């Protein structure tokens, strides 16, 4: 496609928003004409980032509603706090702009419906910026699933397992919104990082859907222990009763019988993991083991009754997604190993040409709803709760996602050169 210069804006310039801004303006055709944050120092920093990278000065706003009055902005990226993503995205679409939101869970089911209705009524898209759908391993594994290596997929697992005790515990000092959620909520607060790739693999909202979920939370003591050890016994939150359990486990049942397990684990010491697991009738994958087991292919001694994983690395080159054959050498220059650049490129392409995004409003509503649904389940003693069908029945025979380089459900070979495909 021919590159068309397109005007973008960004709302939210904390740590994530500033990183996003730098990534966004590196994409051909993007012109950031406005930046906004309610904190003046952060908004000023947004202006500086654009000037440093492009030599041009965007307009600065402290009130995003003033920014939305402009008619020269085609699309907006929202990178604010979790509980403000949706309301701002709805206002963007109502103001005639396409919008992409950073990830996070929903505060209520009603706001998910507001998001869907705003997109349907305005014709403007809302894309969730779930970068993990574009991770190198996840895309290779998607290809393996589509080529039948796993057979019929029965169960998938994932999570957000990330030691964020400092980020959460010192959230007031650093103006970080996570702490407010941990003080007041108890649920699967950050579901989409691994649920996104899982949902795409299982054709959720296009031939399959989530039916019910049940969640359970452990006790909460990780943050208190960390705060006492690092800030002292007299720190005012050292004995605060945080509502969020240290470990939250959520199980989801799908319309075609697949099951999903999600784990949220951010307040205990551990290395980072998204705990991705795939189990099918022919093969199994385990992220933490960096391993795969393929029935009849993975070799093991007959005396090895435990059966060993073989390194996934040896399959990566063979099943590499063409996007990564193209961008692998450049990935270290971009955020989160390159997957930020890819999901932002997908957003830019969709906005530039008014195309359906690869992660659409129905995906956003469905994945984000897991947060408030898990809160309900936990509050009711881990009772099962139904997952709304935000497609209003369209999932049954909905058309496949638009084919493109950035399709997150299928590998669209026709959009890649022979060199990109490794031929």
Predicted region positions:
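A structured beta-alpha segment of the ubiquitous adenosine-cofactor-binding alpha/beta core
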Residues: 57-75
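Predominantly a Rossmann-like dinucleotide-binding segment in NAD(P)-dependent oxidoreductases
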Residues: 12-14, 122-127, 132-242, 284
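Beta-strand-loop-alpha-helix segment that lines the small-molecule cofactor/substrate pocket
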Residues: 68, 74-75, 81-134, 148
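Active-site beta-strand termini and strand-to-loop segments that position acidic
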Residues: 250-256, 280
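Glycine-rich phosphate/pyrophosphate-binding beta-alpha loops
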Residues: 262-272
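C-terminal helical cap and adjacent loop that interface with cofactors, partners, or active-site loops
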Residues: 19, 271-423
């Amino acid at each position: 496609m021919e590159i068309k210069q397109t005007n973008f804006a960004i709302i939210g310039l904390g740590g994530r928003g500033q990183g996003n801004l730098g990534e966004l303006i590196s994409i051909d055709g993007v012109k950031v004409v406005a930046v906004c944050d309610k904190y003046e120092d952060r908004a000023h920093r947004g202006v500086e980032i654009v000037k440093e990278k492009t030599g041009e000065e965007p307009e600065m706003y402290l009130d995003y509603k003033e920014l939305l009055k402009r008619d020269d902005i085609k699309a907006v990226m929202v990178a604010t706090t979790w509980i403000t993503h949706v309301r701002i995205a709805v206002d963007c679409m109502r103001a005639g702009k396409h919008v992409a939101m950073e990830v996070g869970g929903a505060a209520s089911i009603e706001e998910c419906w507001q998001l869907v209705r705003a997109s349907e009524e305005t014709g403007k898209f809302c894309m969730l910026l779930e970068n993990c759908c574009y991770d190198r391993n996840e895309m290779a594994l998607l290809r393996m699933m589509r080529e039948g290596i796993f057979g019929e997929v029965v169960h998938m697992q994932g999570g957000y397992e990330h030691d964020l005790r400092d980020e959460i515990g010192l959230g007031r000092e650093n103006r970080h919104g996570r702490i407010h959620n941990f003080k007041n909520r108890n649920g699967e607060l950050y579901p989409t990082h691994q649920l996104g790739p899982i949902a795409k693999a299982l054709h959720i909202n296009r031939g399959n859907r989530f039916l019910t979920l049940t969640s359970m939370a452990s006790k909460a003591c990780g943050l208190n222990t960390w705060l006492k050890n690092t800030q002292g016994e007299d720190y005012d939150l050292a004995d605060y009763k945080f509502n969020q359990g240290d470990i939250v486990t959520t199980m989801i049942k799908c319309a075609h019988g697949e099951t999903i397990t999600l784990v949220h684990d951010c307040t205990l010491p551990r290395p980072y993991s998204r705990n991705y697991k795939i189990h099918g009738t022919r093969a199994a994958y385990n992220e933490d083991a960096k391993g795969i087991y393929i029935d009849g292919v993975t070799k093991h001694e007959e005396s090895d009754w435990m059966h060993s994983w073989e390194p996934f690395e040896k399959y990566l080159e063979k099943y590499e997604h063409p996007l990564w054959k193209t961008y692998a050498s450049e990935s270290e220059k971009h955020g989160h190993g390159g997957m930020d650049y890819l999901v932002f490129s997908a957003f830019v392409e969709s906005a530039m040409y008014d195309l359906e995004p690869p992660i659409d409003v129905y995906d956003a509503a469905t994945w984000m709803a897991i947060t408030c649904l898990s809160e309900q389940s936990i509050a009711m003693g881990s009772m099962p709760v139904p997952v709304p069908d935000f497609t209003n029945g369209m999932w049954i025979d909905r058309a496949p996602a638009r084919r493109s380089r950035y399709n997150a459900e299928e590998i669209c070979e026709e959009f890649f050169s022979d060199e990109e495909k490794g031929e």
